[in-house]
């Protein structure tokens, strides 16, 4: 699988993060003839960087000190980390919720039981395969009133029973119907036993985190 590099340069506070993406590289379809000066310009300009799999994107603010998606509060950080992490569900460009880490899910007629089947073979960027335990830990972490103060609490998870069925299924038993509950399941799924999310975040998204360099112009 080819890798492409995404370098994010903060335009105001000037912070650089580098992400590496999985997927096919960009294609350069330029035709026709050019003189030597034009060719040199193309070689040194954005087209050459794109051909090498690199993209520079400016954002208007510095990133949070922590890159753990359960701790980030700044919009710029969330936009960057959106490409690194996925929840059971993930919104598309139109705001529709689609399965991500999950393959499929069902909701009971009384809207109290949500049952998710995990997608087979989904791995975190460190090579570890996603398990139901990772999913449950991630969402319980955000619903635990006794969690560290820097964890952003998701009230919708507070009184929900979460449990595993078999090797690939996670269930959420609500105490009362919540029509918005599915939207909260876009919360990032993290590896339970990984402890470096603040500085070296690991998710399942289309891009993986490579590096972060503060004050890089």
Model-found features: residue ranges?
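Short, low-complexity disordered leader/linker segments with a strong preference
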Residues: 1-54, 96, 161, 195-197
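N-terminal lobe/hinge region of extracytoplasmic solute-binding protein
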Residues: 58-107, 140, 202-204
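Solvent-exposed loop/turn segments at secondary-structure junctions
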Residues: 61-65, 95, 121-123, 177-180, ...
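Short clusters of hydrophobic/aromatic residues that line enzyme substrate/ligand-binding pockets
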Residues: 67, 97, 157, 189, ...
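Aromatic- and charge-enriched surface segment that lines or borders ligand/interaction sites
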Residues: 103-147
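Surface-exposed binding/hinge segments that line
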Residues: 106, 110, 151-194, 208-213
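Bilobed "Venus flytrap"/periplasmic-binding protein-like clamshell domains
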Residues: 201-217
């Amino acid at each position: 699988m080819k890798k492409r590099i995404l370098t994010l340069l903060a335009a105001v506070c000037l912070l650089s993060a580098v992400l590496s993406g999985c997927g096919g590289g960009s294609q350069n379809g330029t035709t026709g003839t050019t003189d030597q000066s034009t060719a040199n310009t193309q070689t040194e300009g954005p087209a050459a960087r794109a051909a090498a799999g690199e993209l520079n994107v400016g954002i208007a603010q510095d990133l949070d000190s922590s890159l753990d998606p359960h701790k980030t509060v700044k919009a710029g950080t969330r936009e960057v980390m959106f490409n690194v992490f996925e929840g059971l569900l993930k919104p598309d460009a139109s705001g529709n919720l689609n399965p991500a880490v999950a393959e499929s899910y069902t909701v009971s007629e009384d809207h109290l039981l949500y049952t998710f089947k995990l997608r087979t073979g989904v791995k975190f960027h460190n090579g570890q395969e996603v398990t139901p335990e990772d999913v449950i830990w991630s969402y319980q972490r955000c619903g635990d009133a006794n969690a560290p103060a820097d964890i952003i609490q998701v009230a919708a998870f507070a009184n929900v029973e979460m449990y595993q069925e078999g090797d690939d299924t996670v269930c959420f038993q609500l105490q009362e119907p919540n029509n918005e509950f599915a939207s909260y399941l876009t919360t990032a799924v993290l590896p339970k036993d990984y402890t470096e999310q603040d500085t070296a975040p690991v998710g399942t998204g289309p891009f993986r985190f490579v590096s972060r360099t503060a004050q890089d112009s």
